[in-house]
């Protein structure tokens, strides 16, 4: 039976690697009673290269570090002004498949943007969320021990220039867009609050418990 409680962890601004390793640790040590969690964070500038990533898609990293990680997908960029959300969900317990979880994540972004009269959509062959053929959110997951980690990145109010140093998600010339320019959420905090609502509604969580920072390990 699915626990209908979702724990929301507000991590503020944190470096990528420490949060990544904390996600791995939570996933590796959780059991059938461990709660599902949603981690909300903002990272300093970093390129992350997924398991399908090819080095030729990093055109000119410059002074921005590149980290090889254990999620699906190819290269993407994280930076200030971008909302990053990591759903740590026991999909085995929740009885949902990986594809269904991806669809739920994409739809939660689409539903959130619809509140601002922004018509966003997903693409079957290219995970993420798009507005007028420009990408507003990227997505990459890893499933281990029947549980998800990694997640989504929504462009809110950031410098989009570093995306031009890569082929985002392996697509040359893919244009990026952000919510502030479209009349959507103006801050990462606002976007996080709204996305938490649409995500929890779609996955059937009825009780949200908020925490500041990571749990003591």
From Swiss-Prot:
Organism, by scientific name, is Shewanella sp. (strain W3-18-1)
Which protein is depicted? Answer: Octanoyltransferase
Q: What class of enzyme is it?
A: transferase
Give the GO molecular function terms: lipoyl(octanoyl) transferase activity
What role does this protein play? Catalyzes the transfer of endogenously produced octanoic acid from octanoyl-acyl-carrier-protein onto the lipoyl domains of lipoate-dependent enzymes. Lipoyl-ACP can also act as a substrate although octanoyl-ACP is likely to be the physiological substrate.
- Gene giving rise to this polypeptide: lipB
The further comment given in this record reads: In the reaction, the free carboxyl group of octanoic acid is attached via an amide linkage to the epsilon-amino group of a specific lysine residue of lipoyl domains of lipoate-dependent enzymes.
> Mind telling me which PANTHER family this protein's record contains?
LIPOYLTRANSFERASE 2, MITOCHONDRIAL-RELATED, OCTANOYLTRANSFERASE
Q: In which pathway does it act?
A: Protein modification; protein lipoylation via endogenous pathway; protein N(6)-(lipoyl)lysine from octanoyl-[acyl-carrier-protein]: step 1/2
Which InterPro entries does the annotation name? aa-tRNA-synth_II/BPL/LPL, BPL_LPL_catalytic, Octanoyltransferase, Octanoyltransferase_CS
Q: Which residues form the BPL/LPL catalytic domain?
A: 32-207
Q: What reaction does this catalyse? A: octanoyl-[ACP] + L-lysyl-[protein] = N(6)-octanoyl-L-lysyl-[protein] + holo-[ACP] + H(+)
Q: Does the keyword Acetylation apply?
A: no
- Member of which family? Belongs to the LipB family.
């Amino acid at each position: 039976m699915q626990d209908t409680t979702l724990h929301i962890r507000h991590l503020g601004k944190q470096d990528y690697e420490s949060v990544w390793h904390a996600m791995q640790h939570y996933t590796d040590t959780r059991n059938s009673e461990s709660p599902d969690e949603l981690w909300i964070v903002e990272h300093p500038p970093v390129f992350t290269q997924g398991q399908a990533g090819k080095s030729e898609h990093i055109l000119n990293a410059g002074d921005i570090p590149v980290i090889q990680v254990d999620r699906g997908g190819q290269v993407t960029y994280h930076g200030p002004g971008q909302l990053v959300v990591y759903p740590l969900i026991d999909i085995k317990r929740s009885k949902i498949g990986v594809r269904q979880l991806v669809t739920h994540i994409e739809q939660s972004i689409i539903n959130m943007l619809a509140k601002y009269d922004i018509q966003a959509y997903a693409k079957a062959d290219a995970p993420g969320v798009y507005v007028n053929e420009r990408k507003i959110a990227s997505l990459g997951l890893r499933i281990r021990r029947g549980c998800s980690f990694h997640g989504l990145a929504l462009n809110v109010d950031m410098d989009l220039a570093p995306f031009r140093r890569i082929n985002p998600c392996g697509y040359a010339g893919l244009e990026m867009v952000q919510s502030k320019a479209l009349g959507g959420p103006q801050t990462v905090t606002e976007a996080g609050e709204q996305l938490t609502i649409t995500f929890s509604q779609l996955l059937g969580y009825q009780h949200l418990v908020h925490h500041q920072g990571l749990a003591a390990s």
